């Protein structure tokens, strides 16, 4: 059955766009652009999250002296991003499609204001027939605030832009029930909510990127929980994007079945804000049980056992259960001093209101 998506996010990994020697595979890039153009002309809005800047720059410049990993990455990215976006511009122009470059950093998602500003920018681009091409701005990203890889960025973009599907293109067909190199292994075609995949995932990283299948799976789960279909497929297969939408039953991939529960725009932002958390709120067993139920509940002071770190009102905080496991993230309704003052008391205002609480 044909997939009727009207807006999708497509993430293309470094291993799809780079040859074995690290140079840009222009032939593969051109083929992907042809497919995106075909889908775009059929009425599908597409946001492209593209790796490949570092791989592209690696083939363009040879440092005069040995550089540390950060300097080398920034150099290759600065040179390679210009080459990458220029190539995309030329390829899409052949189809009469305009593209716009969106370079972002993790810090740009840390506040609701910056988050909405980015969303508005890309919304205007889509409304005017422009395909946003998104990548992390490696030249100014600091190591401790870099995305794990573009899988993490693509999940955030898909969520922010209310995409109906996120397609992650890698160099394998999906998630296998064994080692991908084992002929007896098969691709897991569908993954339902809550299915345990820990026995199947190998925490290995790609040759040119920073991510691996473990990262992809974690991102896919979070995005699917927000009601977005997530597909992991092989970007080196001919016509893969068109086939995924027009012949999904006959196309090998791993599909994460989305949750049917609606998630608000604010909670989507909070769900991806864990990396900006300023503190931790630890709750007792009773509060933990309430949060794990179907009941809509806020974090009340009476259920808090202790607070770690210092935070201000509206900062992101982690919610930890009575065993010390993270169960969610939320936006603080007061600062840490006020939270400590109210801790354990009845009749006090929520420290984290339900409307600004995301339970994992």
From Swiss-Prot:
PROSITE patterns: GLUTAMATE_5_KINASE (PS00902), PUA (PS50890). SUPFAM superfamilies: Carbamate kinase-like, PUA domain-like. Substrate binds at residues 51, 138, 150. It is found in: Cytoplasm. Residues 278-356 form the PUA domain. Its EC number is 2.7.2.11. InterPro entries: AceGlu_kinase-like_sf, Asp/Glu/Uridylate_kinase, G5K_ProB, Glu/AcGlu_kinase, Glu_5kinase, Glu_5kinase/COase_Synthase, Glutamate_5-kinase_CS, PUA. ATP binds at residue 11. It catalyses: L-glutamate + ATP = L-glutamyl 5-phosphate + ADP. One of its GO terms (molecular function) is RNA binding. GO terms for cellular component: cytosol. Keywords: Amino-acid biosynthesis, ATP-binding, Cytoplasm, Kinase, Nucleotide-binding, Proline biosynthesis, Transferase. HAMAP family: ProB (MF_00456). Catalyzes the transfer of a phosphate group to glutamate to form L-glutamate 5-phosphate. Belongs to the glutamate 5-kinase family. This is Glutamate 5-kinase. The lineage of its organism: Bacteria, Pseudomonadati, Bacteroidota, Bacteroidia, Bacteroidales.
